[in-house]
Regions:
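Conserved nucleotide-sensing/catalytic segment adjacent to the nucleotide-binding pocket
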Residues: 1-21, 26, 39
Length: 118
């Protein structure tokens, strides 16, 4: 088990190999960590964008298998606060961008898997 810091891309690059199956649990916790890096939300968003782009830049080239777990947070009531709304929006953007690069995407609700891709 490896606990990654905010630089998830670097952590994955350091441990990925053809013989590994890596389970990343969870992307929304990683997003939270990145958005709370600075009290100034605009600065935190810059940091988040850098980390997200770094992950998206390497994910297809990593050897082995990687399973990403995340929470779908955009299907319910979205709080009015700036940080909460940003979190929901950025989680959705991350899910879309990562899904476009993944070979298989499974949305699981109440233990029932729905294959969205692959």
């Amino acid at each position: 088990m490896v606990e990654a810091d905010a630089n998830l891309a670097a952590t994955l690059k350091s441990i990925a190999n053809d013989n590994n199956i890596i389970l990343v649990d969870c992307l929304t916790l990683w997003l939270t960590r990145c958005l709370l890096v600075d009290e100034d939300l605009s600065k935190a968003l810059i940091f988040w964008q850098q980390q997200k782009e770094a992950l998206l830049a390497v994910v297809k080239s990593l050897p082995g298998e990687i399973i990403f777990i995340s929470n779908e947070v955009g299907q319910g009531v979205i709080p009015m606060g700036a940080l909460s709304r940003t979190f929901v929006d950025e989680a959705g953007f991350l899910h879309q961008a990562l899904a476009s690069q993944c070979d298989r995407v499974v949305f699981t609700v109440a233990g029932l898997p729905m294959v969205l891709k692959g």
